[in-house]
Structures are given as structure tokens and as C-alpha cells.
């Protein structure tokens, strides 16, 4: 069994907020187990996000498309109860405007925009990853409200949204991330 060090970063706040993915894999390997394909896919997605330092708002807009993102931002204007009612009555609120073509085009446009912006500048990735705490709790609450219909429910909870609709959405999202990762490695 390998020893795993508890080495924590004491750098800037942006570095502290990052998930130490290599450490997670080392811990798993030291326990003699491997990550499931789904867990490995999630780690790849987080690694991609950390590498590109894409703010969560832009990620949501890219993944959900303009219609889904507008629906998500519309939650900020309504009360939490009203937002939950609105979400529970919609079969799959973010499927509007979400096609593999939209996601690919939106992500590619963002990557192109980021590449053009950074080619003329000599800035570090750390500078691009600044945290904006003032909107954090509002965004966190909206994200919880938006995703709550898709999370596992208590046995006595009757939800109108079938769990079977979440799997194709996640598979589509994972395939888009894979596409981008493979494209990035080819460059």
C-alpha cells in the first residue's frame, strides 16, 4: 500500500478552490480500487474545466444553449418556491435548444474566442481564474433549484420528471466533453 501525503496548497484563493484530481486518483489506487467509467468521465470533465478556467455562468450557457440558459437565469427573478413549481411542471427544462450541434458550436466558439483573446496577451491561467464571491450564493441557490428535480428523491416524493430523461442528457454532455478533450489532444 502506498502512503498518501496530505499536502494542501496555500496559494491564492483560486488554487485553494480547485479539486486535487491527481490526489483523488492516488487515494483510490492506494486503496486498491479503480474509478468507475462514470467517475473517470466526471474527473475528465472537472480537469477540462480547471484547465480552461471557464466561469460557471459561461459553462451553463454553452452547455444549455441560449434558450436553456435564459430559462435558468429567469429563476433569479422568481421566488425559490415559484422556481421549484416551474421546474417540476416542465418535463426537462433545459432540453429546449440543446442539441449536440448547439453544444459543439457553442463550446467551439468559446474556445476560439479564448484562444484569440489570449494569443495577444501574456497572462497566466491563474489570472483568468479569479473568483467572484458576490454572486456565488445566488448562483448556487439557482443551480440547486434547477437541478433538484433531477436528483434522487425520497420514497414518498412523487416527481413528474422521469429519471430516464437525465441519463441521455448526461451522456450527451459527456460525449461533448470527450469530443473536446480528443480535439485538444490532437492539436
UniProtKB/Swiss-Prot annotation:
Say which domain of life the source belongs to. Answer: Eukaryota
Kindly provide the name given to this protein in its UniProt entry.
Answer: Putative uncharacterized protein C10orf88-like
Q: Which organism is it from?
A: Homo sapiens
Q: What is the lineage of its organism?
A: Eukaryota, Metazoa, Chordata, Craniata, Vertebrata
Amino acid at each position: 500500500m502506498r502512503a498518501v501525503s496530505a499536502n494542501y496548497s496555500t496559494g491564492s484563493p483560486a488554487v485553494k478552490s480547485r479539486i486535487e484530481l491527481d490526489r483523488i486518483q492516488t487515494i483510490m489506487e492506494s486503496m486498491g480500487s479503480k474509478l468507475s467509467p462514470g467517475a473517470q468521465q466526471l474527473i475528465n470533465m472537472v480537469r477540462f474545466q480547471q484547465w480552461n478556467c471557464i466561469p460557471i455562468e459561461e459553462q451553463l450557457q454553452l452547455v444549455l444553449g441560449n434558450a436553456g440558459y435564459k430559462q435558468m437565469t429567469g429563476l433569479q427573478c422568481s421566488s425559490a418556491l415559484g422556481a421549484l413549481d416551474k421546474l417540476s411542471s416542465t418535463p426537462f427544462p433545459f432540453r429546449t435548444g440543446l442539441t449536440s450541434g448547439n453544444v459543439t458550436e457553442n463550446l467551439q466558439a468559446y474556445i476560439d474566442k479564448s484562444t484569440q483573446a489570449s494569443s495577444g496577451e501574456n497572462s497566466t491561467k491563474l489570472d483568468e481564474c479569479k473568483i467572484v464571491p458576490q454572486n456565488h450564493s445566488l448562483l448556487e441557490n439557482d443551480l440547486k433549484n434547477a437541478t433538484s428535480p433531477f436528483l434522487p428523491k425520497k420514497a414518498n416524493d412523487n416527481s413528474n420528471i422521469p429519471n430516464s430523461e437525465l441519463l441521455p442528457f448526461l451522456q450527451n454532455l459527456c460525449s461533448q466533453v470527450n469530443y473536446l478533450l480528443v480535439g485538444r489532444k490532437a492539436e
